[in-house]
């Protein structure tokens, strides 16, 4: 017996194996892989759907689970192509100044997968996916979300950026190497972060202890073995981001999407032309 969502699963599998999607694992945004952020947007979106509709069985009547899943996978795909093509504009700049670049890439990828699998997306589904991608920056982009799916992804992307897009490097990570005599450049390499991140984390720690110099902070670390890393909001963001990164690295970006609970509610006849 053929599963009602066999085509949907194959399409998403093919998309996840598309090179620009796989390359999201190689793109870093403030210390967080873009692939990790992409999963976070999916997870937040699912939680938003459950909050509003309680049960996924009810939500599927109002929300296109296929479009929202594919839209999320593709929402930052241009970060891969922009890097590969050495474009002058960043992803955020492209969303405002050249949204045609974003939308043309979406349709190109969808067309390639359709051709590879021999499936054709229903026009409304295709357009919904494209709209999700080109409107996911909301008021910070050129196109505003106009569908239920696009609005969910916009809010989820915004929350992920606010709470989970921060390099989880902490002052204690830096001081651990400083106490061994390593300089700024050496610590940058050890922690795989920029000098700006290091200086920010030291500034936050000094502020919490009301200290003026790095030497004073280092003395506190020597005495106590650790220092406060920042205010409550920063601590929350840092710890949650660290857990998120560890979880996605362990479970795998591909596996998390293929096992996401929206998959079982997808119905091929509502997604693909017959």
Where are the regions a protein language model picked out?
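Recognition helix of helix-turn-helix DNA-binding domains
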Residues: 183-213
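Acidic/His-rich, divalent-metal-binding segments that scaffold phosphate/diphosphate chemistry
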Residues: 1-89
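Short helix-to-turn junction characteristic of helix-turn-helix DNA-binding domains
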Residues: 175-182, 221
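Short alpha-helical "packing" element that flanks the helix-turn-helix/winged-helix DNA-binding module
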Residues: 170-174
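DNA-binding alpha-helical recognition surfaces that contact promoter or target DNA
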Residues: 131, 176, 200, 204-207, ...
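Helix-turn-helix/homeodomain-like alpha-helical modules used for DNA recognition
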Residues: 236-274
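Divalent metal-dependent catalytic cores for phosphoryl transfer on phosphate-bearing substrates
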Residues: 28-29, 58-166
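Basic, Lys/Arg-enriched C-terminal extension of HTH/homeodomain DNA-binding domains
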Residues: 206-242
């Amino acid at each position: 017996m053929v599963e009602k969502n066999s085509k949907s699963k194959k399409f998403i599998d093919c998309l996840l194996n598309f090179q620009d999607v796989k390359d999201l694992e190689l793109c870093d945004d403030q210390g967080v892989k873009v692939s990790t952020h992409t999963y976070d947007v999916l997870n937040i979106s699912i939680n938003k759907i459950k909050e509003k509709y309680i049960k996924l069985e009810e939500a599927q009547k109002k929300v296109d689970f296929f479009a929202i899943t594919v839209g999320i996978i593709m929402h930052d795909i241009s970060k891969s192509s922009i890097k590969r093509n050495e474009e002058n504009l960043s992803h955020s700049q492209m969303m405002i100044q050249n949204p045609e670049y974003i939308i043309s890439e979406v349709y190109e990828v969808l067309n390639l997968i359709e051709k590879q699998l021999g499936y054709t997306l229903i026009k409304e589904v295709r357009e919904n996916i494209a709209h999700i991608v080109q409107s996911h920056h909301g008021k910070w982009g050129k196109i505003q979300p106009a569908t239920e799916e696009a609005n969910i992804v916009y809010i989820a992307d915004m929350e992920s950026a606010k709470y989970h897009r921060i390099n989880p490097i902490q002052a204690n990570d830096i001081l651990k190497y400083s106490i061994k005599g390593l300089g700024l450049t050496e610590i940058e390499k050890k922690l795989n972060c920029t000098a700006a991140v290091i200086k920010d984390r030291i500034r936050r720690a000094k502020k919490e202890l009301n200290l003026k110099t790095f030497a004073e902070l280092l003395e506190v670390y020597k005495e106590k073995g650790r220092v406060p890393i920042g205010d409550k909001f920063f601590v929350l963001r840092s710890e949650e981001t660290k857990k998120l990164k560890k979880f996605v690295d362990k479970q795998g970006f591909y596996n998390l999407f293929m096992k996401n609970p929206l998959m079982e509610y997808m119905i091929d006849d509502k997604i693909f032309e017959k």
